[in-house]
A protein has these predicted regions:
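Contiguous ligand/interfacial binding patches
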Residues: 96-97, 147-159
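Short, low-hydrophobicity acidic/polar segments
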Residues: 1-144
């Protein structure tokens, strides 16, 4: 399953879900009791173990999974500092933040829709992927580090 593909001048950058990727699923009952659980990707699908329950509940999905000790609402902190490490096309997916619109069901089994189907999330990327191609005839050694800055405006938050 493709997460994203960028094609610039026939140079393709593709990220894909890989076995072991961890998505967070937060679910909350109508009484405000909330849980944060991990769903792990394997063989083309994410799976998670949710407790047996029926009734009204709300689901929120996000990536990458973050352990949260006290998930009582639909918020989770995802560390996101200003420095990023990228090694060629070896994408660092810990900065590929995605989330899905909340889903709510009135009287469904845990992990199911009201009509008994498995819940399914449409993930939306919260960051941008940028492609840089550096060329210079004066450089006779490999470029190992580059710093991007924008005059007068920050390009990333401190955390």
């Amino acid at each position: 399953t493709t997460k994203s593909t960028i094609d610039v001048n026939d140079l393709t950058f593709t990220t894909r879900w890989t076995d072991g990727d961890k998505m967070g699923i937060m679910y909350e009952y109508d009484n405000g009791e909330g849980y944060n659980t991990q769903a792990t990707y394997s063989n083309g699908t994410f799976s998670s173990k949710l407790p047996e329950a029926t009734g009204t509940r709300f689901y929120y999905a996000y990536y990458p999974y973050q352990a949260a000790d006290n998930a009582t609402s639909h918020y989770v902190d995802i560390p996101f500092g200003a420095e990023r490490v990228q090694n060629g096309n070896d994408f660092n997916s810990s900065y590929d933040i995605m989330c899905a619109e909340a889903l709510d069901f009135e009287n469904a089994e845990q992990g199911k829709t009201d009509d008994g189907k498995d819940i399914s999330f449409i993930m939306v990327r919260q960051t941008a992927l940028l492609y840089f191609h550096f060329t210079s005839p004066e450089v006779d050694e490999p470029l190992t580090k580059a710093t991007l800055s924008v005059e007068g405006d920050p390009i990333a938050a401190d955390t």
